[in-house]
Amino acid sequence: MAETEERSLDDFFAKRDKKKRKEKSGRSAAAASTASSASSAASSAAGAAAAAGGPRPTDGGGSGAAASSSGSAKSKEEDDWKEFEQKEEIDYSGLRVQSMQISEKEDDESEKREEPSDNWEETSGAVDRSSGPWNKSAPAPAPVVETIVTEPPEPVQTGGVYRPPGAREGGRPRRAQQGPPEIYSDTQFPSLQSTAKLVDSRKY
């Protein structure tokens, strides 16, 4: 039983590896078509170098072929990066954006303000605070007429003993203490039976 499970797992992974190889070969075929133009340029450059410097001795015949293929791969990668480095200028004249150029002097000042100094406690007052919305002068507020509200004076405590607000004299009148609830009262505890009696009395 264990052998069949191992075989099925091996088959599964073998199929998966074949799919990966096919995908890689498909990618390499697409890359090869783009690399063919790059390799022709690289081979012409290599031919010119060989003519200028003469043939180079190699350790083995296969190593020279491997070096040329790796050189073409490097030149292909460099060509790819060169394509991304080239940027086209974009025309922003159609946009309704104001000119956003900063003079070098303002840029230097902002860099000085952003750089933290070692003795920040000493120079915290020396930071340029002249620019910003907080320095704009606001119109003077209208003078506010202060209305004097006279509060009734609180009664003076004699005796120096604290009394909570509920126990003080002159407070709210106390509610009469309520006794225990009347459980059998229909007004305090209405029941469905009493409502049924009420409905029956309405019918007649």
UniProtKB/Swiss-Prot annotation:
<protein>
    <recommendedName>
        <fullName>Protein CDV3 homolog</fullName>
    </recommendedName>
</protein>
<feature type="compositionally biased region" description="Polar residues">
    <location>
        <begin position="185"/>
        <end position="196"/>
    </location>
</feature>
<feature type="compositionally biased region" description="Basic and acidic residues">
    <location>
        <begin position="74"/>
        <end position="90"/>
    </location>
</feature>
<feature type="modified residue" description="N-acetylalanine">
    <location>
        <position position="2"/>
    </location>
</feature>
<dbReference type="Pfam" id="PF15359">
    <property type="entry name" value="CDV3"/>
</dbReference>
<keyword id="KW-0007">Acetylation</keyword>
<feature type="compositionally biased region" description="Low complexity">
    <location>
        <begin position="27"/>
        <end position="58"/>
    </location>
</feature>
<dbReference type="InterPro" id="IPR026806">
    <property type="entry name" value="CDV3"/>
</dbReference>
<comment type="similarity">
    <text>Belongs to the CDV3 family.</text>
</comment>
<feature type="region of interest" description="Disordered">
    <location>
        <begin position="1"/>
        <end position="204"/>
    </location>
</feature>
<feature type="compositionally biased region" description="Basic and acidic residues">
    <location>
        <begin position="1"/>
        <end position="15"/>
    </location>
</feature>
<keyword id="KW-0963">Cytoplasm</keyword>
<dbReference type="GO" id="GO:0005737">
    <property type="term" value="C:cytoplasm"/>
</dbReference>
